[in-house]
């Protein structure tokens, strides 16, 4: 009896020690436990693949981004049809642009439109001459997009732009005003970068376009509007434009910040329009600080 009790106690201790090990082993090999980590890994990988679309939702169907900007700046205008002097002064700008995914291009193409209006009150270098200058432009086209990095977007394309405007000089009695009308094809490039901003996402964007070719209305040197519209002397008023005789470019540098549930947009706009047509020179150099807002909308169909 006394010899069998220690032996039984030893066997019982071994059984208690081995039993948890035997019960824990099936838990490590159970199918439902081994699949869970794999599913978790697949979910993380899928999220990484969807990250570019989350950062740049314009590649998703039905997403449209609209932007309204108001600006104030300084203009430098020369129009030798009216005066050999440069007129300078403040100007105001209204800008509206939108972008959405195109119906073609397999998700890599976006449709881009831009509407701009400028109004300036100018004065001569001696401040004894005043002038008003106004211009409106409307452009539309496409951009091909590359997601070069989850935070970076590169787009290249172009658009067709229609522009028109006038300059009115208060000192001139015979020919006080000059009108403008043009059609052009403009290549465009856009670079955008998204970065964290107080636990949200902000966007910095740089876009530039330049006039490649087009047509433009302009009277020739010494040709009055009375001759054109009353006498029918319309020879030479339509000119083909190229970078050599009409170097024109536009540059936008914008930052969009999430503020109080909205998207505040601010930045700089440079609008440089120049021409040398029919023996006349003209330029309008506009430097503008812009402020506005951006909205991202989902189109329901």
Describe the role of every protein-language-model region.
Residues 25-107, 298:
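Short glycine/proline- and aromatic-enriched beta-strand/turn motifs that initiate or cap beta-hairpins
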Residues 57-64, 101-111, 145-155, 196-203, ...:
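Short loop/turn motifs that connect adjacent beta-strands in outer-membrane beta-barrel proteins
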Residues 285-301:
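Outer-membrane beta-barrel "beta-signal"
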Residues 174-261:
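Outer-membrane beta-barrel transmembrane domain signature
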Residues 72, 94-102, 138-144, 158, ...:
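Residues on the lipid-exposed face of transmembrane beta-strands in outer-membrane beta-barrel proteins
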Residues 64-70, 108-114, 152-160, 185-187, ...:
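Transmembrane beta-strands of outer-membrane beta-barrel proteins
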Residues 86-94, 130-138, 152, 177-187, ...:
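Residues that define the transmembrane beta-barrel architecture of outer-membrane proteins
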Residues 72-78, 116-122, 160-170, 195, ...:
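Transmembrane beta-strands of outer-membrane beta-barrel pores
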């Amino acid at each position: 009896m006394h010899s069998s009790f220690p032996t039984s106690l030893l066997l019982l201790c071994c059984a208690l020690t081995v039993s948890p090990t035997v019960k824990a082993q099936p838990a490590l090999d159970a199918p439902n436990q081994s699949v869970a980590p794999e599913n978790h890994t697949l979910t993380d990988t899928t999220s990484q693949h969807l990250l570019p679309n989350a950062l740049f939702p314009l590649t998703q169907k039905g997403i449209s981004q609209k932007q309204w900007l108001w600006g104030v700046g300084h203009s430098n205008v020369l129009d030798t049809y009216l005066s050999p002097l440069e007129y300078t002064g403040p100007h105001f700008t209204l800008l509206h642009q939108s972008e959405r995914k195109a119906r073609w291009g397999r998700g890599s193409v976006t449709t881009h439109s831009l509407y701009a209006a400028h109004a300036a009150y100018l004065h001569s270098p001696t401040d004894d001459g005043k002038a008003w200058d106004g211009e409106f432009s409307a452009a539309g086209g496409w951009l091909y997009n590359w997601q070069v990095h989850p935070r970076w977007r590169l787009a290249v394309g172009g658009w067709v732009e229609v522009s028109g405007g006038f300059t009115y000089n208060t000192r001139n009695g015979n020919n006080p005003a000059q009108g403008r009308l043009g059609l052009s094809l403009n290549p465009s490039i856009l670079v955008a970068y998204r970065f964290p901003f107080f636990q949200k996402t902000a966007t910095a964007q740089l876009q530039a376009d330049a006039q490649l070719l087009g047509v433009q209305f302009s009277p020739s040197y010494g040709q009055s509007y009375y001759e054109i519209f009353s006498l029918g002397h319309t020879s030479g008023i339509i000119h083909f434009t190229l970078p050599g005789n009409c170097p024109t470019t536009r540059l936008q540098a914008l930052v969009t910040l999430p503020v109080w549930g909205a998207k505040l947009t601010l930045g700089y706009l440079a609008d440089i329009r120049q021409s040398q047509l029919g023996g006349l020179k003209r330029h309008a150099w506009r430097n503008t600080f812009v402020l506005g807002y951006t909205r991202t909308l989902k189109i329901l169909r």
